[in-house]
Regions:
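N-terminal cap/lid segment of alpha/beta-hydrolase-fold proteins
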Residues: 30-67
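Active-site glycine-rich loops that stabilize anionic/oxyanionic intermediates
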Residues: 70-71, 78-83
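The serine-hydrolase catalytic nucleophile loop
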Residues: 81-93, 108
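Conserved alpha/beta-hydrolase
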Residues: 96-115
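Alpha/beta-hydrolase active-site loop
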Residues: 119-139
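Gly/Ala-rich beta-loop-alpha elbow adjacent to hydrolase catalytic centers
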Residues: 148-156
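Short alpha-helix in the alpha/beta-hydrolase fold that links the catalytic acid
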Residues: 184, 206-216
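Short beta-strand/loop motif that positions the catalytic acidic residue
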Residues: 191, 197-199
């Protein structure tokens, strides 16, 4: 009789009749593995960086990485094209090793391993950039500078005008006047943070005159326009693609990120 009672107890326990037992985790509830780190994804510097999925509005999951430590942080907004976060990776590595700057890099919707629902590209880029700044602040950043190249420069200007609390500075490397309904001149007129603009005279996408117009439109006193040598565009102006021979502009941008606005 005792054996029968014990057997019945085991059966009832296995049934979970009180509804308190939890089903095994399904594949959908198991966290996805982190995206490849920049050293693997991009090549170039082999510095270890933390890769992660950056959540953005609408259910977007963006391939992202952070390198370096400390409260002084740069959030990089890449150019259009397939390179995504890789375009700024060598520079971010240099900042971490030589300037004590932490960098947040991410690939926008439609680039790299980032996964996004269908939607307006402009809205997605702006929302993703805002999410990256928020992530940086949530993870210890006390001083945040947005740095954008080409289209990323346009996006960086726009986000710098709208995000609250404000970022501590913004850098526009060859960002054109307009992109898919976003007007850089209108954004420049609303800026209330230190702003650095850079352009090369041989740039076929944006002229020195256009960049000077954006610079002059910024109402704050703390601003600077750098006309670099040659014909580079966007992150090309920084030089040092192989991790060396960084341009004078690269040093200027690093100082801007560190809060030395001159």
């Amino acid at each position: 009789m005792l054996l029968m009672v014990l057997a019945l107890s085991v059966v009832l326990a296995g049934c979970g009749g009180d509804g308190s037992s939890r089903p095994p985790a399904s594949a959908a509830t198991i966290a996805a593995p982190a995206p490849p780190p920049p050293a693997e994804l991009c090549g170039g510097p082999t510095t270890k960086a933390q890769s992660f999925w950056l959540s953005a509005p609408g259910g977007a999951q963006l391939s992202a990485a952070v390198v370096g430590t400390g409260p002084t942080t740069a959030v990089f907004v890449h150019e259009a094209g397939p390179r995504g976060l890789c375009g700024f990776w060598p520079y971010a590595d240099w900042l971490a090793k030589t300037k004590g700057v932490r960098s947040v890099l991410f690939s926008q919707c439609g680039t790299g391993a980032s996964q996004c629902p269908a939607g307006n590209a402009t809205d997605q880029w702006l929302a993703a950039t805002t999410a990256a700044v928020t992530w940086a602040r949530d993870h210890g950043a006390r001083q945040v500078t947005l740095v954008g190249a080409s289209v990323g420069g346009i996006v960086a200007l726009q986000v710098a005008t709208s995000i609250r609390p404000r970022v501590d500075g913004v850098v526009n490397l060859s960002g054109e006047r307009r992109w898919m309904g976003v007007d850089s001149l209108a954004a420049a007129r609303r800026l209330q943070v230190p702003a650095l603009f850079a352009v090369a005279p041989g740039d076929s996408y944006v002229s020195v005159g256009t960049m000077r117009q954006l610079y002059r439109a910024v109402p704050v006193r703390t601003k600077r326009l750098v006309v670099a040598e040659g014909a580079g565009h966007g992150w090309e102006l920084l030089g040092g693609a192989a991790g060396s021979d960084w341009s004078p502009l690269a040093v200027t941008v690093a100082a801007w990120i560190q809060g030395r606005h001159r």
